[in-house]
Amino acid sequence: LTLAEACRGFPIEVRRQAEITSLGFVEVPLDGRLVFALSEGLLQRGRAVGGVSAVLTRGHLAHHVGQEFGLAIADDPRRMFVEVHNRLVKEGYYGPLQASSIDATARVRPGAIVSPTGITIGPHCEIAPGAILEPETVLAADVRILPGAVLGSDGFQTMRFDDAMIDIHHAGSLEVGARTVVMANAVLARAVFRQATRIGSDCRIGNGAFVSHNVQIGDRTLIGHGAVIAGNCTIGSDVTIGPGAICLDRLEIADRAYVTAGSVVTRCVGAGERVTGNFAIPHDLHVDFVKKIASRSS
């Protein structure tokens, strides 16, 4: 796809042509991608991450875009980026969906809703009544999906403009590892661009939990009931995210970390670290703080 083909019909001036294979944010490590940039800092970040093929930006930033990149100019690059992406999704640019494949040993119970296209269900999986599987969802062997769970939906990726709020259509996939259990009413979102949201093997996703777009979760990790994992987080293996905890976007929670129930995580958490509170701090510090408050009030 050429940059001009992607931008056709929109108020965008293509000044330098390029071939693109995907759209993506500057932080997303995808080769051949079109990015938007509203500042010189974002342009530098895109160059540092690599894989950029073309840049959609404002006219006054054009001279900061190297000759090796395609260049498109718009008054509102951010909005045009979203509009271009959403149209390409609707036109099937990110790939035609294949007929769904369900292993003969899998059990899809009556009342489950499985898209006729874009689904792969592995051996011995169990899909309960009321579960919903949207396109581009891949289940490895022995996965269990309990009633009311929704897999492969759009995550919460919305951009606000002066006159509108526009959702970014999700064009990636969701992959769930072997023997993982997704409990009742949990929601697992697919990725936004040509990437995957990945849940490892032997994980447990609790009742009513929400795992947003582009999240990566390692093996044997437990996401507690009602927990929220915001977009682009990386959660390691053998991690526990307690019930009702919230992990804000783009954080890394390393292997064996423990986030206690109801905590709000605003920073990365190291391997084996235990954090508590709103906002979450090392657990021992939180306990000391509570003891000090209690001693003052007694």
What positions do the PLM features span?
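Terminal amphipathic alpha-helical/low-complexity segments used for targeting or macromolecular assembly
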Residues: 1-105, 142, 148-149, 153-167, ...
